[in-house]
Amino acid sequence: MDCLCIVTTKKYRYQDEDTPPLEHSPAHLPNQANSPPVIVNTDTLEAPGYELQVNGTEGEMEYEEITLERGNSGLGFSIAGGTDNPHIGDDPSIFITKIIPGGAAAQDGRLRVNDSILFVNEVDVREVTHSAAVEALKEAGSIVRLYVMRRKPPAEKVMEIKLIKGPKGLGFSIAGGVGNQHIPGDNSIYVTKIIEGGAAHKDGRLQIGDKILAVNSVGLEDVMHEDAVAALKNTYDVVYLKVAKPSNAYLSDSYAPPDITTSYSQHLDNEISHSSYLGTDYPTAMTPTSPRRYSPVAKDLLGEEDIPREPRRIVIHRGSTGLGFNIVGGEDGEGIFISFILAGGPADLSGELRKGDQILSVNGVDLRNASHEQAAIALKNAGQTVTIIAQYKPEEYSRFEAKIHDLREQLMNSSLGSGTASLRSNPKRGFYIRALFDYDKTKDCGFLSQALSFRFGDVLHVIDAGDEEWWQARRVHSDSETDDIGFIPSKRRVERREWSRLKAKDWGSSSGSQGREDSVLSYETVTQMEVHYARPIIILGPTKDRANDDLLSEFPDKFGSCVPHTTRPKREYEIDGRDYHFVSSREKMEKDIQAHKFIEAGQYNSHLYGTSVQSVREVAEQGKHCILDVSANAVRRLQAAHLHPIAIFIRPRSLENVLEINKRITEEQARKAFDRATKLEQEFTECFSAIVEGDSFEEIYHKVKRVIEDLSGPYIWVPARERL
């Protein structure tokens, strides 16, 4: 009887609870986080007498320096190998065995499965134990330089294919694109299905696994999936495809990433890795044996696929990303449809749901005629294990998308001055707003390719606000406008959806709304002005004191502090105007406070203390940013005094995040700091110039400095009197 020998390999995943704290990094490194590939001279990498090996072969090698910025989930890849446990044969190299979807490495796009790590920053890991390599990566800091080696891929055969559209269109399906990689680490667009009887099938040259480089004159390298689909759809009857044919060595598994080893099982690696990066401990193995394992959403938009049309029962376990899909619909009984599936999320990994599915029920709750709000509540309150009855209805979903498309066309026509009877006349054309929330177009429906994503604090020039749901806008950088133009959700749309969310939250809580009146923030109107002073700095949230101290000590020529006022008697060693402005009359200081000459004041031991507007102005007019340790209320008082501050809120992601950033405080102190920060954000969000987050103080401090640099002026955006 044959024996089956299973060999396991050590692994380490750089994310979630295993993510180490970020260490100090050289000041110049953050600017290199997105640097282009650098081919490293092999002489600098090879020690005398050391023979480099990759996968036990002597193939032609290439070298690359890759700089990654550690994200919320760490570096986003898995490794195996080492002198104590070689991954392939007797090769002691440290190999990349998995690229985590959505992680830092996947977003950068250059690191590949089977790359061999030679150096981590300046640490040589070519011939070390597995634990030593893990330690080198843990101690590498927030900005990590990897020197990697890989075998050069065989040259692809590029050819041009002419297709003539038939009744089934072009007759093939695609997958891939930026943010939706079909093969981890590769943004290319791949052919995943040839429709029998279609144009591609009749021509015979296009094959599964082919890479589409261009459609007519439109390049498809490093584009989003939606853009590739649009390029293929927006063609006439005759279409020219520029196609790269893969090497024969890889044709055995067109869906798998090129694997140049014979002893490494991609299937095994996926099977033992999935549960750990989802942050779950479900006993059910999620073995991704389907060829769709690298394709989060079914992308059969160019031809019909044989997909069961009967209702299906799907069980999904809620993960750290929720259920991992978005829904649309719920108006006029049109049904609830899945519009987006998050790559790497529970729905994606189950392989059971697809865009275009109608959700018929959730845990027995009938959603066939539910409103969008009712469906959202049912999904939110479904618990950890969710049973969904879904039915694939591409025709109905296509009609829903067609309605969105018609709206988009109307908006476009309106913006060009043609107008339509269904759109209101446009009372507001050409105004500027500042976003008070983050918007990710991929999480919304309908406008995936033409919507404009933005972050909190971004300034947008609204070109056309004639529609109630979508405004046409252009992003503004500094004192110039970019070519980034698209559609953003209107104030009404944002507030309606947020109220629905808050209503669902209150409905699902045991205490109900308790009379709470949550304010919904969307945008504020802004106007541009020129300033001739250094803007004061107000940092709020956990670690603000450390950030203030570091700015003053690191850049004494750029930052300063003002001298406070007090009615306390002067002590012998104190100097008036240096330590304090000593006010002899309490009555006078009280009058000045009532006259709004102080941005903040209080009483301690029967003496008044305060920071005057004039003290801040003196520092600002000296060309130094005045660092202020005040409350958020001071922001509005400074604005009223025409000293527009840069207010930066340091937002903790969680209680654990507070403890990780400041290891010297107790859990109780961290909980109080987290609660204070949460309340501060709820009450003063509109006062913040920017919101920063980070896994370490070093990361936060770097972002704080970048915000100050970006918002220093001389041209700045300030709140306008006009209300939306």
UniProtKB/Swiss-Prot annotation:
Residues with the modification Phosphoserine, per the entry, are 73, 142, 295, 415, 418, 422, 425, 449, 480, 606, 654
Q: Where in the cell is it found?
A: Cell membrane; Postsynaptic density; Synapse; Cytoplasm
Q: What name does this protein carry?
A: Disks large homolog 4
Chain spans, region Disordered: 15-35
- Functional summary from the UniProt entry: Postsynaptic scaffolding protein that plays a critical role in synaptogenesis and synaptic plasticity by providing a platform for the postsynaptic clustering of crucial synaptic proteins. Interacts with the cytoplasmic tail of NMDA receptor subunits and shaker-type potassium channels. Required for synaptic plasticity associated with NMDA receptor signaling. Overexpression or depletion of DLG4 changes the ratio of excitatory to inhibitory synapses in hippocampal neurons. May reduce the amplitude of ASIC3 acid-evoked currents by retaining the channel intracellularly.
Tissue spec? Expressed in brain (at protein level). Detected in juxtaparanodal zones in the central nervous system and at nerve terminal plexuses of basket cells in the cerebellum. Expressed in cerebrum. Expressed in hippocampal neurons (at protein level). Isoform 1 and isoform 2: highly expressed in cerebellum, cortex, hippocampus, and corpus striatum.
| Species whose genome carries this gene | Rattus norvegicus
Q: In the record, which positions carry Phosphothreonine? A: 420
**Similarity field:** Belongs to the MAGUK family.
The UniProt entry's GO CC annotations, sorted and at most eight, read: AMPA glutamate receptor complex; cell junction; cell periphery; cell-cell junction; cerebellar mossy fiber; cortical cytoskeleton; cytoplasm; cytosol
List the top taxonomic levels of the source.
Eukaryota, Metazoa, Chordata, Craniata, Vertebrata
Per the record, the gene is Dlg4
